[in-house]
Regions:
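A short, polar/proline- and glycine-enriched secondary-structure boundary/capping micro-motif
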Residues: 51, 59-62, 108-111, 133-138
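Edge beta-strand at a domain terminus
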Residues: 119-121, 128-143
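Short Pro/Gly-enriched beta-strand edge/turn motifs at strand-loop
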Residues: 20-23, 69-71, 93-96
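Tryptophan-anchored aromatic micro-motifs
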Residues: 23-36, 51, 98, 140-141
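Short, surface-exposed beta-strand-loop junctions and turns on beta-sheet-rich folds
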Residues: 46, 55-57, 104-105, 130-132
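Beta-strand-rich cores of mature extracytoplasmic or soluble domains
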Residues: 78-129
């Protein structure tokens, strides 16, 4: 009985730590190039991220950078700053999956998974079709 209670205690502790980890992506992150900060938030048990800082928010003419590469003509005038680029991620117990990432430099949207690395950084994996055919980059938490 004593062993059973100890196992039960460790199991409960494990589930508690596990459930706390699901929001580890929430917060502000700097992308791999250092050109942008993305604030990841949780809404209705899904995770979303928008650009909240740009190293160069203005174009070469001094105008606010807009989403010029967007395939939707009506969105091309939308500012990059404030643009939601991560959408609809769900936590599957190990990583955040089933989401989409939008690349304003190309105007393309990709399937995406996010993994929390052991050092606390995020591994962002964008892909088309299969996850093995894609590109990864590492984002660091803004301190």
């Amino acid at each position: 009985m004593k062993n059973f209670l100890i196992i039960l205690l460790f199991t409960a502790f494990g589930f508690s730590a596990y459930s706390q980890n699901k929001d580890a992506v929430v917060g502000e992150w700097v992308n791999a190039t250092g050109e942008a900060h993305v604030d990841i938030v949780k809404r209705n048990n899904k995770y979303f991220g928008k650009i909240v800082w740009l190293k160069n928010p203005k174009d070469e003419h001094g105008a606010t950078k807009t989403d010029q590469k967007n395939p939707n003509e009506s969105l091309k005038s939308k500012p990059i700053l404030g643009l939601e680029i991560l959408k609809d991620f769900v936590f599957d117990g190990e990583k955040w999956t089933d989401g989409k990432i939008y690349d304003p430099k190309s105007g393309k949207t990709y399937s995406c998974n996010i993994t929390l690395k052991s050092d606390g950084d995020l591994n962002i994996r964008g892909y088309i079709g299969l996850s093995i055919i894609g590109r990864s980059e590492v984002w660091k938490k803004v301190k």
